[in-house]
């Protein structure tokens, strides 16, 4: 280590202290991970300089052979990791090692505090860029010496991980470009000075990073520990399952094994290679708005970026891996990537291939596909919401799988649904809800189930959005059962139950009583509903809410109100089931005795029941309680 001047002691950002404690506590059985993280950071530093040097060749100082060197001093119990990458100046050291972005840190801390497993934390630290601090698991002190490319002054950062760090200027400015990390190991961690222990860790975690990793032996010779050959340049048959697993770990930052591997060399209009993985485990931050793409773009094996390039659409953000193209210029800027025609062609080709492979998998092994769908189905359906995404809409819909009233736990395709449609049925019917159990119990389904008409059950939040964008599949309209009461009337001949047919045959006298009661109900409920009508869909429940064709879906309207994007609440249609014992008794009572306070209370309570079943907030809870008490008091008189 070099002598220093102008030292300044600073305190860690408050969040760093929390991370240090939690990482060390959570990873005590996975200490190897610290070396993976430090080598990964060194590789990133080389990537950054390699990219920057494309526009400023002077930055590399005639030293363009990027590498990472690991050495040890067993007598002093020290471990060294150095690279000749971009390096850091004083402010970089403070920003990168003394603070962490608050949004990412808090999510990281939340995940650990929520009981994330030790292996889960291993994956999290790489995802959030807090892996550097894992060095304090094995080191009593960490010293970082660095000189940034293009600058002449080097700096030192050091800390015991106790809440403070010291920044100093290196007195001798002959320090090489890049970064050297010195770990003064704890006495019990001397195993990490063993050459074979280090080789095992590198082989396990860092074998396929893009730069050579060397071990500096006692003779001063550099022994290569990894294969820095780009794994994606090999043919499919040359890559073993173990190699895929190691590379997947490097690029994915999630646990488990890849669920699907997509390795293709494309030599058509645009030449590129992709090595993409779909994980078998859902990342914890899959739906976080700050989540970045995890597919890296290379040009002729030179890393360009994984940020600010829409080569992978958001609805495929579960993909991990790389795309390498020889058709893009090496000096392309991140800005010009946005509207690049070659990028757009690669994107279209990738989307096409992914959706095609997903459809094949769904058709050949639905049991295995169900695992994918439970992890990433709701993400894939986000693509249906994009109004501009009409090109792949049919392919997306073909890859989608749904639960339905046809089977309790089997997933179906829309093709399956269409094949089972009843004669005379013109629509694909669906119902949205919060969860499968509650949707299956919805009164909205009763008339469809009794007539043997299948209904698709949608329970992901995204379903409320795409069903307002997608109007049909293979020219068959999609329709919510909440709007389908008139359809059931037209499909009455499809009833499979004689009992239902008999129920639909009413005497003139009975029909008049029902019509009169419906008018009375509309008068009592007045401004609380848009209308009251006899339901064609209810068989077991007394009431339900409905909306007219062309009206906004109930759940979508509620969402927009909650997001302050809608400042009113529309009135709904109240449907009543005149065959339900409660409603039948009310109709008879009204026909025999006319209007009454009890009937008014019952109508309000039935409306409230319908609202509760649809997840609607009651307009007046006190009124609901008072009417309920009045009815209960009458029962116990």
From Swiss-Prot:
Residues 335-558 are annotated as: B. Residues 559-637 are annotated as: C. The keyword Transcription does not apply. Its main location: cytoplasm. Keywords: ATP-binding, Chaperone, Cytoplasm, Nucleotide-binding, Stress response. CDD domains: HATPase_Hsp90-like. The keyword Cytoplasm applies. Residues 1-334 are annotated as: A. InterPro entries: HATPase_C_sf (IPR036890), Heat_shock_protein_90_CS (IPR019805), HSP90_C (IPR037196), Hsp90_fam (IPR001404), Hsp90_N (IPR020575), Ribosomal_Su5_D2-typ_SF (IPR020568). Pfam families: HATPase_c_3 (PF13589), HSP90 (PF00183). One of its GO terms (molecular function) is ATP binding. It is found in: Cytoplasm. GO terms for cellular component: cytoplasm. Homodimer. Belongs to the heat shock protein 90 family. Molecular chaperone. Has ATPase activity. This is Chaperone protein HtpG. The gene is htpG.
